[in-house]
Amino acid sequence: MTTDQITLRSPAPDEMRAFFGPIADAFSEDMSEPEFDTERRLLEPERCVSAFDGDRRVGSSAAYSFRLTVPGGEVGAAGITGVGVLPDHRRRGILRQMMAWLHDDAIRRGEAVAVLGASEGAIYQRFGYGQGTTTSTFSLDPAHARFRDPVPPDPSRRIRMVDEDEAARIFPMVYDAVRGDIPGAVGRSEDKWRLYMLGDAD
């Protein structure tokens, strides 16, 4: 796809390191090798798009494939992620072109929904996005953490530590058992569980 000398295309598998360049620059962040390896394992190159001004990569974005719970079932969804345009190429319609590319790709795949997590949500209202939820992160000091209500002892119920392999087997089953009852819950791939939920980014 070419518009006003800006060309869009998916990166080849051996271009994935370069693909992340505009995203890292747009957020003023360096991507470590472990972070790159994590993202490389999660993203599908054919769902990634870069914008080029001549031979220079000036923007990048991507979409994850996942299943989204909706009332009555689940649908395929595109998880838009990593939207970045270099500062010297902003206000030239590159974001709009990449979003159109990702949306068209989602339509071709039969995906009914596109979602994204945004650092600046107002940017994406022009593309039809609205706030669906918020996120919060909490840290608990184990020395002072308590159940809200006392839990009566029950010898038939036990708590035990599990290693990563067992967690990777059990946690997805528990999650998937309840996910179907929670509209807006997202399916997670095995790699997503291992790399993000269980912390194996090596």
Located regions from the model:
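Amide-forming acyltransferase catalytic core, primarily the GNAT-like/NAT-type
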Residues: 135-202
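A conserved beta-strand-loop-helix scaffold within acyl/acetyltransferase catalytic domains
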Residues: 8-83, 175-202
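Conserved active-site alpha-helix within GNAT-family acetyltransferase domains
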Residues: 108-112, 117-137
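Short beta->alpha linker loops
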Residues: 14, 118-119, 166, 188
